[in-house]
């Protein structure tokens, strides 16, 4: 098995820590909030408020399940438009009260069903991109599994984008890439090599800003490393004026 194939397998492993796991382990007194105030609550997106070293932080994440029933409840981590609208509601609330935002991303992509399209999936994703680009508080996005397509990007327009070591971030799945390009989904491993989707490759290209090591570390050590990194980064970002924060975020994405 190639290194890319191994990382792809680990990124999709059902035993990985979820967004809710990180929210509860990293932040004290985490309180989950629900609903988009428009249609319904989407179990694929979790969000709420917690404390980090005494500072209130808004946490948003895409949640996969840990077993079949959990995955059915979470729609296998594929958000509907109401999930993205819930995320935006919480982020705008964070802006109103001056709370930084941390997002945890693990999705193969936004849900492509008819109902999701009818309720404005494309609009919901596009609005998140627009609103996050101008959100007047610090944002840190962390890829914790799969970072698939616009469904992931809708929570990743951030001042800093990080990845865990054994995760992926891509425009679509390697299977989808192989099917479109070669009409043969079985060539997914070859596609993954071409796509440059691993954390190390993306760090080298400047797409992400930090890779958090996983191999050889216990779960508690990974959680502590993420917590420390968030604390340090928020301390730096909080020193910037709102104007400088937004300009740096804009220039970060203009580099692409």
Swiss-Prot record:
Main localization category: cytoplasm
Keywords, in A-Z order: ATP-binding, Cytoplasm, Fatty acid biosynthesis, Fatty acid metabolism, Lipid biosynthesis, Lipid metabolism, Nucleotide-binding, Transferase
Catalytic activity entry: N(6)-carboxybiotinyl-L-lysyl-[protein] + acetyl-CoA = N(6)-biotinyl-L-lysyl-[protein] + malonyl-CoA
Localization in the cell: Cytoplasm
Pathway: Lipid metabolism; malonyl-CoA biosynthesis; malonyl-CoA from acetyl-CoA: step 1/1
GO CC term, one of those recorded: acetyl-CoA carboxylase complex
Highest rank taxon of the organism: Bacteria
GO molecular-function term, one example from the UniProt record: carboxyl- or carbamoyltransferase activity
Top EC group: transferase
Biological processes annotated in GO: fatty acid biosynthetic process; malonyl-CoA biosynthetic process
Domain CoA carboxyltransferase C-terminal: 1-236
EC number: 2.1.3.15
Signal peptide range: none
Chain's role: Component of the acetyl coenzyme A carboxylase (ACC) complex. First, biotin carboxylase catalyzes the carboxylation of biotin on its carrier protein (BCCP) and then the CO(2) group is transferred by the carboxyltransferase to acetyl-CoA to form malonyl-CoA.
Entry's family note: Belongs to the AccA family.
PANTHER family tied to this protein: ACETYL-COENZYME A CARBOXYLASE CARBOXYL TRANSFERASE SUBUNIT ALPHA, ACETYL-COENZYME A CARBOXYLASE CARBOXYL TRANSFERASE SUBUNIT ALPHA, CHLOROPLASTIC
Subunit structure comment from the entry: Acetyl-CoA carboxylase is a heterohexamer composed of biotin carboxyl carrier protein (AccB), biotin carboxylase (AccC) and two subunits each of ACCase subunit alpha (AccA) and ACCase subunit beta (AccD).
HAMAP family, A to Z: AcetylCoA_CT_alpha
Entry protein name: Acetyl-coenzyme A carboxylase carboxyl transferase subunit alpha
Native source species: Streptococcus thermophilus (strain CNRZ 1066)
Encoding gene, per UniProt annotation: accA
